[in-house]
Amino acid sequence: MDDLESTCASLRAQISATETQLAGLKRALHEAEQAAAHAKAQSAAATTAGDNHDKPRRWPLLDEEYRRYGRQMIVPQLGLPGQLKLRSARVLIVGAGGLGCPAALYLAGAGVGTLGLIDGDMVDVSNLHRQVLHRSANVGKLKVDSAIEYLRELNPHPTYIPHRAHLTPQEAPEIFQNYDVILDCTDNPATRYLISDTAVLLGKPLVSASALRTEGQLMVLNNPPRPAGDKTGGPCYRCVFPKPPPANSILSCADGGILGPVVGTMGVLQALEAIKVITSTEDEVRPPSLHIFSAYSSPPFRSIKLRSRRANCAVCSAERQVTLDTLRSGLTDYVFFCGSVSPEAVLTAEERIAPREYRAMYPAPTEGAPEKTPTLIDVREKVQYDICNLAESINIPISTIQASAAGSGDETGSSLPAWLPPEIASTDSTDPIYVVCRMGNDSQLAVRRLKELGLDRGGARVVADIQGGFRAWREQVDPEWPEY
């Protein structure tokens, strides 16, 4: 027994040492790739200069640059000084998706000198309706490489630096320190807090935006950048949102949906704000505001004035708890701070059924009638239910189910909510109840809620979810089921 324990301890130590070595190799590779990208860009710039290298330049820009940028240079707010500032600016875009694509497109077109892009995802066909730098031919390609390929065709003058991985607290400081302005084009709270914290700690202005369905928000944060405790500095993301939203309230574009022109509008506005930050003087910095865009409202734009830095902010106050050391060491846990959004542990294996097993037990109505007919509840929102649905299902949206508090009844005094159909609410029925959703997440929450209402009759009635939702249904039962 002692020998086995010693062997296990030795293996753990070897694994730990190997993981440490691997992390070091990854950092070394990242640094080497950055150095190679810079060297390649400098070589290209030297080649472009060509014959002009040995003779004094009469004008500060190349002749081709005057022709390319002339229409924006004659705008009074920009002019030649602004164009020169753009050419020397280094901008980092975190996220090459719906926000990052239009932002990168317009910054590259405007002549920003160095443009870095961070993203570890690959292009999916579902991205193409809104992520305008990616083409159908690039499905399956890294988003960063796909985006830079397009940008180089648009404007070969800027230096494009790819960061082919998701942002981590350990690597963020080393990446951010090489840039002047940061754009947050991500879609999850944990990364937003990480980006803001790193930008504040390194003194970088941050342009942050978000978009979902038909609405978007935009803020310029940490502008002007000031040391911790300096109240004249711009607020950070933590100053505006000291506490993250509840984990179960967060919707991604995949879950909530997104209209392409909406996220495109916000990305273009990010590019505009970045240009203003780069070309403006400190005297021209405006008070911080939250800009809200609602595509179906009139007027569609409104702004809310933001407060200055919070006196007790965890990152930009004099008594900050977040530092570069806590980032690099992993002591600042962003996933823990924001909470987990995964409902994987909500139900046990006995409370779930695979799509193929469900269809084997209960054939479609046209194929035969089972002895015990189950109730199949589809908890997708009505707009999704109307896209495609199973004929034998009924639609009770998850928002309706979650809106009623446990144990609350309707106005008649019933112990069950009014949204339950009579055949489900009947105290005599033991017919099974199955719940299905799009991905297999909301259905678990719905099953738990139905059991809280006592619909499982103390275990005498099956109340279960179809594991993996309609995504798994397409894989296991019906390959023609629409995937959206």
Curated annotation (Swiss-Prot):
It is found in: Cytoplasm, Cytosol. Binds 1 zinc ion per subunit. One of its GO terms (biological process) is cellular response to oxidative stress. The active site is at residues 253, 437. PROSITE patterns: RHODANESE_3. Zn(2+) binds at residues 236, 239, 313, 316. Pfam families: Rhodanese (PF00581), ThiF (PF00899). Residues 370-482 form the Rhodanese domain. Its cofactor is Zn(2+). Its EC number is 2.7.7.80, 2.8.1.11. GO terms for molecular function: AMPylase activity; ATP binding; identical protein binding; metal ion binding; molybdopterin-synthase adenylyltransferase activity; molybdopterin-synthase sulfurtransferase activity; thiosulfate-cyanide sulfurtransferase activity; URM1 activating enzyme activity. Pathway: tRNA modification; 5-methoxycarbonylmethyl-2-thiouridine-tRNA biosynthesis; Cofactor biosynthesis; molybdopterin biosynthesis. Its main location: cytoplasm. Keywords: ATP-binding, Cytoplasm, Metal-binding, Molybdenum cofactor biosynthesis, Multifunctional enzyme, Nucleotide-binding, Nucleotidyltransferase, Transferase, tRNA processing, Ubl conjugation pathway, Zinc. ATP binds at residues 98, 119, 126-130, 143, 187-188. Residues 39-58 are annotated as: Disordered. It catalyses: [molybdopterin-synthase sulfur-carrier protein]-C-terminal Gly-Gly + ATP + H(+) = [molybdopterin-synthase sulfur-carrier protein]-C-terminal Gly-Gly-AMP + diphosphate; [molybdopterin-synthase sulfur-carrier protein]-C-terminal Gly-Gly-AMP + S-sulfanyl-L-cysteinyl-[cysteine desulfurase] + AH2 = [molybdopterin-synthase sulfur-carrier protein]-C-terminal-Gly-aminoethanethioate + L-cysteinyl-[cysteine desulfurase] + A + AMP + 2 H(+). InterPro entries: MOCS3/Uba4 (IPR028885), Rhodanese-like_dom (IPR001763), Rhodanese-like_dom_sf (IPR036873), ThiF/MoeB/HesA (IPR045886), ThiF_NAD_FAD-bd (IPR000594), Ubiquitin-activating_enz (IPR035985). In the N-terminal section; belongs to the HesA/MoeB/ThiF family. UBA4 subfamily. Plays a central role in 2-thiolation of mcm(5)S(2)U at tRNA wobble positions of cytosolic tRNA(Lys), tRNA(Glu) and tRNA(Gln). Also essential during biosynthesis of the molybdenum cofactor. Acts by mediating the C-terminal thiocarboxylation of sulfur carriers urm1 and mocs2a. Its N-terminus first activates urm1 and mocs2a as acyl-adenylates (-COAMP), then the persulfide sulfur on the catalytic cysteine is transferred to urm1 and mocs2a to form thiocarboxylation (-COSH) of their C-terminus. This is Adenylyltransferase and sulfurtransferase uba4.
